[in-house]
Amino acid sequence: MIFYLHITIFLVVCLLMMLFFSLGFQGKKAKEKNSPFECGFDPFSLSRVPFSLKFFFVGIVFLIFDVEIVVILPFPLVMMTKNLMFVFSFTFINFLIVLGLLYEFKYSMLDRLK
């Protein structure tokens, strides 16, 4: 019975929040509020710099191989337990990461910036 009370309170709070957000204050949009602030001066140039897609790819590759290091480090301890399920899962994860590396080499994502 008390479980349903918690759910009911949660749903009422969610509905009230949705109501408040939908009826919330819609402020006037002004040029000054949407422009970047540079110590009270008008901006000299466009504040948005173009984003390098190559930099994004390098960051994603770094994250993938960082996760691979986290997977590889405990492998000697897993081998001591001699559990085949852990060994197969480790091999499968590393196989997927090697396939990703080959894909990156094929599409030259790992070349240096030109």
Swiss-Prot record:
Name of the protein in question: NADH-ubiquinone oxidoreductase chain 3
Record's catalysed reaction(s): a ubiquinone + NADH + 5 H(+)(in) = a ubiquinol + NAD(+) + 4 H(+)(out)
Location, primary (coarse class): mitochondrion
One GO location term (cellular component): NADH dehydrogenase complex
Keyword Zinc-finger found: no
Single GO molecular function: NADH dehydrogenase (ubiquinone) activity
Entry membrane topology: Multi-pass membrane protein
Role, per record: Core subunit of the mitochondrial membrane respiratory chain NADH dehydrogenase (Complex I) that is believed to belong to the minimal assembly required for catalysis. Complex I functions in the transfer of electrons from NADH to the respiratory chain. The immediate electron acceptor for the enzyme is believed to be ubiquinone.
TM ranges: 1-21, 55-75, 85-105
Homology family: Belongs to the complex I subunit 3 family.
Organism this protein belongs to: Rhipicephalus sanguineus (Brown dog tick)
Pfam family, one: Oxidored_q4
Localization terms from the record: Mitochondrion membrane
Domain of life: Eukaryota
InterPro entries assigned to the protein according to its UniProt record, in alphabetical order: NADH_UbQ/plastoQ_OxRdtase_su3 (IPR000440), NDAH_ubi_oxred_su3_sf (IPR038430)
Keywords: Electron transport, Membrane, Mitochondrion, NAD, Respiratory chain, Translocase, Transmembrane, Transmembrane helix, Transport, Ubiquinone
EC number(s) reported in the record: 7.1.1.2
